[in-house]
């Protein structure tokens, strides 16, 4: 399968997987126009859409795409039923698309019904995990997001993390504000800064590398614990995650 990213709006990415026959899977099409342009340019035949959550910048293009290609099956969580979903899926279930099984993983936090899709090596994680960061807590709690990130972090090392937004540079600036002397974070920040200066995409990222540079996945890391302890004593990694998320919200 081939992985493609389609830029949308200011910083969204719509991911498309296609096979050798030209059949394709579209993930979180917030805008139909760039997707339709890519379909025409590549002569793709859309087979399915995956929705991770109900926010408009992830579902806004569904109606137009389905009108154009009525054979499309739209998979999504319960919260997307009124956004065009035709096949509701939940945690532990699978979606069989393009000859591959995609596992559905419940990841509440950004929204209560947020889900991710995984078929090795591809992880479509919507607004749960970003490179260097994680989604804001619009509906869920810090505890829920912490558990959700733990689920994703436990996936295989070679997982390709396909995030839905180009937030990497700002996330790495935040990471540097927390751990300014961390070698991995500094190296990755320089790499990301160079890519963005050329207007190049920073995604997807390899999960093994992401665990090293994403402070939200390092809540049991002694360097991070020492930084937090300078301000407040927090015993549980879940509490340290909440501290980080609160800091990021104000960054």
Swiss-Prot record:
It catalyses: an S-(2-hydroxyacyl)glutathione + H2O = a 2-hydroxy carboxylate + glutathione + H(+). Pfam families: HAGH_C, Lactamase_B. Its EC number is 3.1.2.6. GO terms for molecular function: hydroxyacylglutathione hydrolase activity; metal ion binding. It is an enzyme of class 3 (hydrolase). The keyword Hydrolase applies. Zn(2+) 1 binds at residues 53, 55, 110, 127. Pathway: Secondary metabolite metabolism; methylglyoxal degradation; (R)-lactate from methylglyoxal: step 2/2. Zn(2+) 2 binds at residues 57-58, 127, 165. Binds 2 Zn(2+) ions per subunit. Keywords: Hydrolase, Metal-binding, Zinc. It comes from the Bacteria. SMART domains: Lactamase_B (SM00849). InterPro entries: Clx_II_MBL, Glyoxalase_II_hydrolase, HAGH_C, Hydroxyacylglutathione_Hdrlase, Metallo-B-lactamas, RibonucZ/Hydroxyglut_hydro. Its cofactor is Zn(2+). GO terms for biological process: methylglyoxal catabolic process to D-lactate via S-lactoyl-glutathione. The keyword Kinase does not apply. Belongs to the metallo-beta-lactamase superfamily. Glyoxalase II family. PANTHER family: HYDROXYACYLGLUTATHIONE HYDROLASE, HYDROXYACYLGLUTATHIONE HYDROLASE GLOB. Monomer. HAMAP family: Glyoxalase_2. Thiolesterase that catalyzes the hydrolysis of S-D-lactoyl-glutathione to form glutathione and D-lactic acid. This is Hydroxyacylglutathione hydrolase. The gene is gloB.
């Amino acid at each position: 399968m081939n992985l493609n990213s389609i830029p949308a709006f200011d910083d969204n990415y719509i991911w498309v997987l296609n096979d050798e026959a030209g059949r394709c899977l579209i993930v979180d099409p917030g805008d139909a126009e760039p997707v339709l342009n890519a379909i025409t340019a590549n002569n793709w035949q859309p087979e399915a859409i995956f929705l991770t959550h109900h926010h408009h910048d992830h579902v806004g293009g569904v109606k137009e795409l389905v009108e154009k290609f009525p054979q499309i099956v739209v998979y999504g969580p319960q919260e997307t039923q009124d956004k065009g979903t035709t096949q509701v899926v939940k945690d532990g279930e699978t979606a069989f698309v393009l000859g591959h099984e995609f596992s559905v993983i419940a990841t509440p936090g950004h929204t209560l019904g947020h889900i991710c899709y995984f078929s090795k090596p591809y992880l479509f994680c919507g607004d749960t995990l970003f490179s260097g960061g994680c989604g804001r807590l619009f509906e869920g709690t810090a505890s829920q997001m912490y558990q959700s990130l733990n689920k994703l972090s436990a996936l295989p090392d070679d997982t390709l993390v396909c995030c839905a937004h180009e937030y990497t540079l700002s996330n790495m600036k935040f990471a540097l504000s927390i751990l300014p002397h961390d070698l991995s974070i500094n190296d990755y920040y320089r790499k990301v800064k160079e890519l963005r200066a050329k207007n190049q995409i920073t995604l997807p990222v390899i999960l093994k590398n992401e665990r090293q540079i994403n402070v939200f996945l390092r809540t049991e890391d002694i360097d991070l614990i020492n930084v937090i302890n300078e301000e407040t004593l927090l015993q549980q990694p879940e509490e340290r995650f909440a501290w980080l998320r609160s800091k990021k919200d104000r960054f």
